[in-house]
Amino acid sequence: MSTQEQGNLKHGLSNRHIQLIALGGAIGTGLFLGISQSIKLAGPSVILGYAIAGFIAFLMMRQLGEMVVEEPVSGSFSHFAYKYWGPFAGFMSGWNYWVLNVLVCMAELSAIGLYIQYWWPQIPTWASALTFFILINGINLLHVKFFGEMEFWFSIVKILAILAMIGFGSYLLATGTAGPQASISNLWALDGFFPFGIEGLVMAMAVIIFAFGGIELFGITAAEARDPDKTLPKAVNQIIYRILIFYIATLFVLFSLFPWNQMAEGGSPFVMVFASLDSQGVATLLNFVILTAAVSVYNGTSYCSSRMLLGLAQQGNAPKALARINKRGIPTNAVLVSAFVTVLCVLLNYIFPEKAFGLLMMLVVAAIVINWVVISWTHLKFRKFMQRQGQTTKFPSFMYPFSNYLCMAFMLGILVVMSLTPDMRVAVMMIPGWILCLMVAYQFKRRKIKTEQPVHALEADM
């Protein structure tokens, strides 16, 4: 990696930026909109599902955190896969993560269109997607501080809104003003806590995982963070509190306020529940917050996709032109290329306005599975390398190596679940073809480089 290129990135993200980005990073469409599909599959037991998936996500982020604290680089786990596993692993994980972020960008833009239609049903989803596409990408071309400030305030809004919703919902329950249908017994009174059995919960796990996509954002910010040794461990350890407050507590209140079997699909259950309680003002405000959350996640994934493309270019796995960084510290070409591909979302929403979000969500989950498996496997190789060198790490992961194998087994189980679900099967079937395309592209890249390159130092260890 060119030190000059790396040095041109600005350390414009302060401790408050990193902490709030990490704290608010998982509050997005997966919680507010994706939850409707998981409720349909599992009922109240999705609360347990989010707890299980959140625990796996926490274990894996500790694995990534251990590597990032040792080497705070822009390529994140793609860099680590390249260095500790081999060149193709870095090539595959980097491009897969870039595609993942582009897909998440598309999903968030699709969701933004649905939220706008809550107020103005006549506005097509593609029009809303195009508007926010232009706005966010324009801002991201200015300076990394603008990204940090936007995410900081977006996260403040999301966090305060979630806490207010929990508080207001708890007040309604405690005072009995939420109506006769509101009761904690909603968690078990309607066909039990597992209305569709354990099978229902298992089938919902693939949808639940979508909510945790993008949780790796802290790793991408490492190269532009000040004092990464201090800020990054704090950001990682916050994940467990995010899960308990933003998912478990929120869903507990939601299910208590309204019977789960009356929550309609297509929109946000949160908005629908408060609207049904004659709290139209609260529902309108909540829809604004949910819209803010979707814009926030789109902003973050736009940032991630451009920085991953920059890292790939610095590794030689993408055209060198994408490694150029302007005087403001922005990888302009990487931002523009990522944006150009993301704009396909506008076309997708124009052709499939009602199915775009669901299709993109399943593709995102498949890409998440690949990336999380790569992170856990790369971490195994990272720890073995550190042990051979006789070095200890500053921020060791939990339960190594058991947690690595547990995370990988869980993610492979998600693929099995998706393959058994007709609506999700196509995403799983695309994975072998996608990896084959990456293998062909990698071989093409190697043949294009005529001069023989030195053997990768750590590849020789393999």
Which residue ranges define each predicted feature?
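Helix-loop-helix connectors at the membrane interface of multi-pass transporters/channels
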Residues: S2-Q6, H79-Y82, E108-A129, A161-A164, ...
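Helix-loop-helix junctions that connect adjacent transmembrane segments
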Residues: Q4-K10, V46-I47, P124, I156-F288
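Membrane-interface "cap" regions at the ends of multi-pass membrane proteins
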Residues: M1-S36, L41-S45, A57-R62, E71-S74, ...
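Extracellular loop-to-transmembrane helix junctions
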Residues: K10, L33-S128, F132, I239-R242, ...
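Membrane-helix boundary/coupling elements in multi-pass transport proteins
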Residues: V73, N96-S110, F212-A225, Q280-K320, ...
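Membrane-interface loop-to-helix entry segments
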Residues: G113, W126-A182, G213, V236-I240, ...
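C-terminal membrane-solvent junction of multi-pass transporters and transport-like membrane proteins
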Residues: W153, A321-T332, V369-P422, E452, ...
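TM-loop-TM module centered on a large, flexible mid-protein loop between adjacent transmembrane helices
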Residues: H79-A81, G86, Y118, A235-T301, ...
